[in-house]
């Protein structure tokens, strides 16, 4: 199973990049949700503009699909500068990063997605560039090799990551601004869906937008993807106008339930309930029961279910909670299992 094959995957598909770019907000005034992040960035950007300085380096972290790339582009637009975009895996050698740094103009934004995947050699080049706006380059080889320093124009590095814990301390400490993006509430997602529908010339009422929002797992990227699929359903099975009923029919057909679960989420939870009496069960046994790899369970399926309170990890294995039994209308066994969660 590939995560990007799931309709409710938070990872971007290749074709989605072009569509998302067309509906992406370009200014903080258009940015929906994340009120704390938005307020802080308004202050930091206004202060930097007032001093006519480059904005301090910014680290943005949080789950995929919440708008890290969008925020990086907004920062560049608000500062009135250009943005150069790359990613950690692309910067294989120190020379790759050096080439990008030497092409920056004063105040420009360098956006590095998946910054936690930078190699140690590339990070070493980045440290003096971030701290002193200098680039150390080795010329020659062997005993004749020597280091020269090149001055760089002041610039802003914006790094994005879904796994902030994998950043090295020296790199993390060089970011003056650190922002965490949280999952969106239903109201903000409804606003995002309504805006996306307007920009895409899709007719939708507020109830229809809310029905999509509550099944979008708190993630704008998923919300916009579901909007496109519901639009298809509305155009073929109705008059093209998305109502709550049309959205409900479409999403039920797509097997996305009221909590945003798809067939894989349900299969995992039901296996724990029906085959293991709710747990505790080891991840290897669970993987065998649903014919999935251990990594798929740990990295793709579990995080959302744990965060939403449908399952927990304990020293004895995985267990479902009472929420899972209620969701499927199953009476939990009277064994006091939840009292033993932390034994």
Curated annotation (Swiss-Prot):
Superkingdom of the organism of origin: Bacteria
Protein residues bound to DNA: 294, 313, 318
Region Small ATPAse domain (RuvB-S): start-end pairs: 185-255
GO cellular component: cytoplasm; Holliday junction resolvase complex
SUPFAM superfamilies recorded: P-loop containing nucleoside triphosphate hydrolases, Winged helix' DNA-binding domain
InterPro entries: AAA+_ATPase, AAA_lid_4, DNA_helicase_Holl-junc_RuvB, P-loop_NTPase, RuvB-like_N, RuvB_C, WH-like_DNA-bd_sf, WH_DNA-bd_sf
Record: residues binding ATP: 23-24, 65, 68-70, 131-133, 174, 184, 221
Cross-referenced HAMAP family: DNA_HJ_migration_RuvB
Family: Belongs to the RuvB family.
Role according to the record: The RuvA-RuvB-RuvC complex processes Holliday junction (HJ) DNA during genetic recombination and DNA repair, while the RuvA-RuvB complex plays an important role in the rescue of blocked DNA replication forks via replication fork reversal (RFR). RuvA specifically binds to HJ cruciform DNA, conferring on it an open structure. The RuvB hexamer acts as an ATP-dependent pump, pulling dsDNA into and through the RuvAB complex. RuvB forms 2 homohexamers on either side of HJ DNA bound by 1 or 2 RuvA tetramers; 4 subunits per hexamer contact DNA at a time.
Name of the featured protein: Holliday junction branch migration complex subunit RuvB
Gene: ruvB
């Amino acid at each position: 199973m590939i995560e990007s094959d799931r309709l409710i995957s938070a990872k971007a598909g290749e074709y989605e990049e072009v569509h998302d770019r067309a509906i992406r907000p370009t200014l903080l005034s258009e940015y929906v949700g994340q009120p704390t992040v938005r307020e802080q960035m308004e202050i930091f950007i206004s202060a930097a503009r007032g001093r006519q300085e480059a904005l301090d380096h910014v680290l943005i972290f949080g789950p995929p699909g919440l708008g890290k790339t969008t925020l990086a582009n907004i920062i560049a637009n608000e500062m009135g500068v250009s943005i150069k975009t790359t990613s950690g895996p692309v910067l294989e050698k120190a020379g790759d990063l050096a080439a990008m740094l030497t092409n920056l103009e004063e105040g420009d934004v360098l956006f590095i997605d998946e910054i936690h995947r930078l190699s140690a050699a590339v990070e070493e080049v980045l440290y003096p560039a971030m701290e002193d706006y200098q680039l150390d380059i080795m010329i020659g080889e062997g005993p004749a090799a020597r280091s020269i320093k090149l001055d760089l124009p002041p610039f802003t590095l914006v790094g994005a990551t879904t796994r902030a814990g994998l950043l090295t301390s020296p790199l993390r400490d060089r970011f003056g601004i650190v922002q965490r993006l949280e999952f969106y509430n239903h109201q903000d997602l409804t606003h995002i869906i309504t805006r996306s529908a307007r920009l895409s010339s899709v007719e939708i009422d507020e109830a229809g937008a809310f029905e999509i929002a509550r099944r979008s797992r708190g993630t704008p990227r998923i919300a916009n993807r579901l909007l496109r699929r519901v639009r298809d359903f509305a155009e073929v099975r109705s008059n093209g106008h998305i109502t709550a009923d049309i959205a409900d029919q479409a999403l039920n057909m797509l097997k996305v339930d009221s909590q945003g679960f798809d067939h894989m989420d349900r299969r995992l939870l039901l296996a724990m309930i029906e085959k293991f009496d709710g747990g505790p069960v080891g991840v290897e046994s669970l993987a065998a029961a649903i014919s999935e790899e251990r990594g798929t369970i740990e990295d793709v399926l579990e995080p959302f279910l744990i965060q939403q309170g449908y399952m927990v990890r304990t020293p004895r294995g995985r267990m479902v909670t009472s929420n899972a039994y209620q969701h499927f209308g199953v009476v939990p066994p009277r064994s006091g299992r939840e009292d033993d969660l932390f034994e």
